[in-house]
Design a protein with these regions (language model features):
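Dynamic helix-loop-helix/coil hinge segments at AAA+ ATPase domain boundaries and subdomain interfaces
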Residues: 6-28
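Short regulatory helix/loop adjacent to the ATP-binding pocket of P-loop NTPases
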Residues: 132-146
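Short conserved motifs of the RecA-like P-loop NTPase core
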Residues: 174-186
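Conserved nucleotide-sensing/catalytic segment adjacent to the nucleotide-binding pocket
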Residues: 84-128
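The conserved phosphate-sensing helix
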Residues: 187-201
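Conserved AAA+ ATPase "SRH/arginine-finger" region at the nucleotide-binding site
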Residues: 136, 147-159
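Phosphate-binding P-loop
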Residues: 24, 33-40
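Walker A/P-loop nucleotide-binding motif
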Residues: 40-57
Length: 225
C-alpha cells in the first residue's frame, strides 16, 4: 500500500465529552448532566435519533468514572448487554437506548426488576431513549415516570454549520468553499449523521491529500445515500 493511501494524520475517534458536544439550545440539559446530577436520583434523557443522546450518556459515564465513582455503562441496542441489567449496581448505572426493550415482555420485566433493585440500593440511573411510550408494562411505565425528564432539541442550521466547522478543525482538514452549505442542503439534518459524514470525509481527505470539498462530499453521499 502506498504512503498516500494511509491517513497518517487522522486523529483517533473523538471521545464523547461535555466540552466537545455542540449544545445549541440544550445548554441547560448539558449543565444538568455535567454538574447537576444528584446521588441516587434517576434521569431520562429523551430526544429524537441523531440529537446526541448517545454522546451525552457516554460523557456522563466517563465523568462519573473520573470522579472515582462506581459506574456501569449498558448499551441496550446490543442484545448481548441485556444480562448486565441483572448484575449492575454501584453509584451509577448509565443506559443508552433503554427504549430498545420496549415491547419485549421479557426485556421489560428485566428492566423493571433492575429499577426496583436500584431504587432499594439508592443507585443513580441515567437512561437515554427516544421516549418512554414504547413500553407496555404499566408498572414499568410508572417507574420510568419517576425519572427526571431531560429532552434534547435538534440543532438548528447555524448550530449544525458550527459543528461541521469544529469537527473539521479537530481532524485538521481544510473545508472547501461552499462545502458546509452543500452538506446542509444535501445531507440528513441531524447531528449524528452530519458528524459521521464529516469524519468519513476527513478520512478520505487525509488519505488522498485533498480538501474536504463538494465533489468529495458528493461521492460520500453517493456511497451512503
Amino acid at each position: 500500500m502506498s504512503r498516500t493511501q494511509l491517513p497518517l494524520a487522522l486523529k483517533p475517534p473523538r471521545r464523547p465529552r461535555f466540552d466537545n458536544f455542540i449544545a445549541g439550545a440544550n445548554r441547560a440539559v448539558v449543565a444538568t448532566l455535567a454538574e447537576g446530577l444528584e446521588a441516587g436520583a434517576w434521569y431520562f434523557l429523551g430526544g429524537a435519533h441523531g440529537t446526541g443522546r448517545s454522546h451525552l450518556v457516554a460523557a456522563v459515564f466517563a465523568d462519573r468514572c473520573r470522579r472515582g465513582e462506581r459506574a456501569l455503562f449498558i448499551a441496550l441496542a446490543d442484545r448481548r448487554q441485556r444480562p448486565l441489567l441483572e448484575q449492575a449496581g454501584g453509584d451509577w448505572v448509565v443506559i443508552d437506548d433503554v427504549d430498545a426493550l420496549g415491547g419485549d415482555d421479557d426485556g421489560e420485566r428485566l428492566l423493571f426488576n433492575a429499577l426496583n433493585r436500584w431504587r432499594a440500593e439508592r443507585t443513580g440511573v441515567v437512561m437515554s431513549g427516544v421516549s418512554r411510550e414504547a413500553f407496555r408494562l404499566p408498572d414499568l411505565r410508572s417507574r420510568l415516570g419517576q425519572a427526571t425528564r431531560l429532552t434534547l432539541k435538534p440543532l438548528d442550521e447555524a448550530e449544525l454549520a458550527d459543528m461541521v466547522t469544529r469537527l473539521a478543525a479537530e481532524h485538521e482538514v481544510v473545508l472547501g468553499r461552499g462545502v458546509v452549505d452543500y452538506m446542509l442542503s444535501r445531507a440528513p439534518r441531524n447531528a449524528a449523521r452530519m458528524a459521521q459524514l464529516v469524519e468519513a470525509g476527513a478520512r478520505r481527505a487525509l488519505t488522498e491529500r485533498r480538501t474536504l470539498s463538494i465533489p468529495l462530499v458528493r461521492e460520500l453521499l453517493g456511497d451512503h445515500p
